[in-house]
Amino acid sequence: MTSLTKRTALVLFTAGLLPFGVQAQSHDARDPDAYSGGLTRNEGQFALDPRHRLRMSDEHLFASFRMDKLEYVRAKGEAWGSYEGQAWFGSTFNRLVLKGEGEFADGKMHESRTEVLWGHAVSPFWDTQLGARFDYGRGEPSRQWLAFGVQGLAPYWFELDATAYLGSGGRTALRFSAEYDLLLTQKLYLQPAMEVNFYGKDDPERDIGQGLSDGKIGLRLKYEVTRQFVPYIGVEWASKFGKTADMARDAGSARQETRFVAGVSFWF
């Protein structure tokens, strides 16, 4: 490297053409330890013990819990409770994620979807997620799935979550949800949200048909008492489609319904 001047080496290093650690040799190159009193960077009274070295933010572990919906639901003279939320623990790039959604009434769980996932950041706004999903329905057989999906913030501030599932017996499923915050004031905002579910084959034991199975669209008016505590009221339209709607009709259940909701969102 004696043929390279320091300026040439700096240009090559900046451009990524000079390997790290290779330095240009010059007759006037200064010894980096010339004025250190005989000490190097790894010794002396101000040297840090490796156990106490400075840790950057991406090396720390964090945790968060967020309950997006904890609400009272009323439709056609019936009432029940509903929840949807997620928690995570890990670093900036890799974390353990728990997702949950379900309905309950009279102190008993009626149905739930729980996911245990490993999340990995692939960009500043997107995570990939890999893990397992567990479905529970009262009086129905439980289902277990492998899950792979993406979750993140799309352009124009749309929050998206799309996950594909593979279950036993050749079962497949796809779930997609989206929501958006439309600010009315600094604290008051409307939140439209939607969710759809697709299944690859019929599952008559759980009253699920092949294809587009069910979906819902909701609109909630939220008020931020604080950033961490947000009460709301809203309305939601839920519908079943295709073979799932036929199964609901045969069982005497509603294929479509309008739901009125009131609840809170909170996180810490």
Sequence positions of predicted segments:
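Residues that define the transmembrane beta-barrel architecture of outer-membrane proteins
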Residues: 61-63, 79-83, 110-114, 142-146, ...
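Transmembrane beta-barrel strands of outer-membrane/channel proteins
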Residues: 69, 98-102, 130-134, 162-166, ...
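Detector for outer-membrane/organellar transmembrane beta-barrel domains
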Residues: 141-204
